[in-house]
From Swiss-Prot:
Positions in the Cytoplasmic compartment: 308-669
Region spans: Legume-lectin like: 38-259
Record organism: Arabidopsis thaliana (Mouse-ear cress)
Extracellular compartment segments: 22-286
Single GO molecular function: protein serine kinase activity
Subcellular location field: Cell membrane
Residue positions of the active site: D469 (proton acceptor)
Signal sequence segment: 1-21
Primary localisation category: membrane
Source taxon at top rank: Eukaryota
Protein name: L-type lectin-domain containing receptor kinase V.9
Chain's gene name: LECRK59
Length: 669
């Protein structure tokens, strides 16, 4: 991937001795033009400093040309300092979140080993968190990165040698009258003023931001008590850094002042340069109008001819390779699927996800209702192995697995054919059809159904099948509301007693176990983790992660349920379930606790699916110290004390095996 690096170094416009004296005095600034003999060079004639352009994965640096003497001796104390600047972050992609900028104090003029994207041009994968960096920064971040424990996609943080902030807060300010907190959106067309002030005597670093038309608030947004002396050298460079990733933003500095041992001069807002106008909408309209007026007739003729040729010659074309002969009974003709789905019309669309669209249809030869998942698979390498696995999975027979009937391969597209489930997915009943709510008995039955199907995949077939994408959207319901696990598009096979090979991390956010995200190695235990999340989701009636939850404690489902266990675990139950007077509180509590058990972050602690079925059937009881085991997720080292219990719970149980010999299908790899 091609990276674009934009580095702007502020150069001196006057003599070097004059600039040196000013840096030693520790005061400089610009306000949209050169003044006070600061010698700062601007980036354009209007005084607007732009850190990044419209390139993807780029970063920009702007540094004052001369170092600032923060200490009088190597072992001395860092002097007090104050700086204020006006900045703006403008999205280039319809206000989508990109990446932010940072004010930085660095031992070098420029950060030669920095990276773009989430690293903000400050650090890279290797040196992030290295104590030898000697970098102090204040980030204005517009992207939430889980690896740095970011609270949201609109926050301000104080960073020392690492992008995991010492202290952070959602961007905003406190009103002077009553202390009310007001949010500020960092990405917009309106400039924002920031103040960063360090009191050497109190060893306190304060950060304040506010709209430029308002005075500086009395209460800072962030206040960190920390001696900066160990982190800063005698002389350091000050400046700004910003970065873009796949989503691009433009970063501007409109004005900036800095002072040692005093308060930085305020910026004259009336003399700031103007931000460039967003001309994208106007330009697009003009281009469209001209293009349509000149080429509408030609395009119409071209599309008509192309459509007719496509219908007549190529729409039903497919290639059958020699190696597919052995899978013949599992292969459908594209023509049959095309007719069954009425040409894959949108009116026949059942749903779509990250791995393909699903259409309903009826086979004309047998009048059988089917579901067809259309999957893009444009890599020829591995296609034969993939089709072989599909044919193998097609031989599965279990009442709680959706039948995979076969496949069709055409050019770079793959079609998986399943039994059609008339009631649709569990996801629809949990979130999209409030008028058709499920009572507790139905929910508990679905949980047991999915557990039975998953246990069959893990323990009762001739090979181990790891599903890798367990979630409500992949649990389908028949006319009797029986739950069936479907969509084997990501499934992996391995022999009993052997570990599966490492592959790309696949699945759905919120259901991926910690060890899978680290190692890329899926296992039956990672399936158990996802099943635990599914149990909690069915019981609580909410998604695994709610970025806009009413309180931080409710953002992550597992954390919320665990917190409530200490008080009353039943308070997390879906209100629609509570309306049913017949629901069994003891049964609900069992499912919630078992869900936390299965979703434990340490794989060795999780039970096997055989054990899960015994817990659900009441054949076995949950451990008496389960709360301590689950609570230990907050301190991974604490689980060592439960090692023997974890190993015994992970042993598979004896469950009757269901054996069938007819062919089988599902929707989607």
């Amino acid at each position: 991937m091609k990276f674009f690096v934009l580095v702007l170094l502020l150069v001196l416009q006057f003599f070097s001795n004059k600039a040196l004296s000013q840096s030693e005095e520790g005061e400089f600034g610009f306000n949209g033009y050169l003044y006070d003999n600061s010698g700062i060079a601007i980036t354009n004639s209007k005084g607007l400093m732009k850190l990044t352009n419209s390139s993807e994965f780029s970063y920009g640096h702007v540094f004052y040309n001369s170092p600032v003497r923060f200490k009088n001796s190597p072992n001395g104390t860092v002097s007090s300092f104050s700086t204020t600047f006006v900045f703006a972050i403008v999205s280039n992609v319809n206000a989508l979140d990109g990446h932010g900028l940072a004010f930085v104090i660095s031992p070098t003029k420029g950060l030669p080993y920095s990276s773009s994207s989430q690293y903000l041009g400050l650090f890279n994968l290797t040196n992030n968190g290295d104590p030898s960096n000697h970098i102090v920064a204040v980030e204005f971040d517009t992207f939430q990165n889980q690896e740095f424990d970011d609270m949201d996609n609109n926050h301000v943080g104080i960073d020392i040698n690492s992008l995991s902030s010492e202290k952070a807060s959602t961007a905003g300010y406190y009103e002077d009258d009553d202390g009310t907190f007001k949010n500020i959106r960092l990405i917009n067309q309106k400039p924002i003023q920031a103040w960063i002030e360090y009191d050497s005597s109190r060893r306190q670093l304060n950060v304040t931001i506010h709209p430029i038309h308002l005075p500086k608030p009395k209460i800072p947004l962030l206040s960190l008590t920390k001696d900066l002396s160990p982190y800063l050298f005698d002389s350091m460079y000050v400046g700004f850094t910003s970065a873009t990733g796949r989503l691009r933003s433009s970063h501007y500095i409109l004005g900036w002042t800095f002072k040692l041992n005093g308060t930085a001069s305020n910026i004259d807002i009336s003399r700031l340069p103007k931000l460039p106008r967003d001309s994208r909408s106007t330009s697009v309209k003009k281009i469209l109008a001209i293009s349509l007026s000149l080429t509408s007739l030609a395009i119409l003729v071209f599309l008509t001819i192309s459509y007719m040729l496509f219908l007549k010659r190529k729409k039903l074309m497919e290639v059958l390779e020699d190696w597919e002969v052995q899978f013949g009974p599992h292969r459908f003709a594209y023509k049959d699927l095309y007719i069954a789905t009425k040409g894959f019309r949108n009116s026949e669309l059942l749903g779509k996800g990250g791995f393909g669209k699903v259409y309903k249809g009826t086979l004309s030869t047998s009048n059988m209702d089917i579901a067809v998942k259309k999957v893009s698979h444009d890599s020829r390498q591995g296609m034969r192995e993939f089709v072989a696995e599909i044919a193998t999975i097609g031989r599965l027979r279990h009442p709680n697995l959706v039948r995979l009937l076969g496949y069709c391969r055409r050019k770079g597209e793959l079609y998986l054919v399943y039994d059609c489930m008339p009631k649709g997915s569990l996801d629809k009943f949990l979130y999209h059809q409030p008028e058709q709510s499920l009572d507790w008995s139905q929910r508990f039955k679905i949980i047991k159904d999915v557990a039975s199907g998953l246990c069959y995949l893990h323990h009762q077939w001739v090979q181990v099948i790891i599903h890798r994408d367990i979630k409500p959207a992949n649990v389908l319901l028949d006319d009797s509301m029986n739950g069936k696990l479907g969509d084997f598009g990501l499934a992996k096979l391995c022999e009993h007693g052997f570990d599966p090979q490492t592959s790309n991390v696949a699945g759905t956010f919120g259901y991926i176990s910690p060890e899978l995200s680290r190692t890329g190695k899926a296992s039956t235990s990672s399936d158990v983790f996802a099943f635990g999340i599914l149990m909690l989701e069915i019981t609580c009636g909410r998604r695994p992660v709610l970025p806009r939850a009413s309180s931080p404690s409710e953002m992550v489902l597992t954390d919320w349920v665990l917190d409530c266990w200490e008080d009353d675990i039943l308070q997390v139950v879906d209100e629609r379930v509570k309306q049913d007077d017949k629901y069994l509180e003891e049964q609900v509590a069992l499912v919630l606790k078992l869900g936390l058990f299965c979703s434990h972050p340490v794989a060795a602690v999780r039970p096997s699916m055989s054990s899960v079925i015994q817990f659900l059937d009441g054949v076995a009881q949950l451990p008496n110290n389960l709360f301590d085991i689950v609570k230990a997720r907050e301190n991974v080292g604490a689980i060592e004390g439960f090692g023997e219990a974890a190993e015994s719970l992970a042993e598979p149980c004896s469950v009757a095996t269901l054996t069938f010999t007819e062919p089988f299908v599902s929707h989607g790899r």
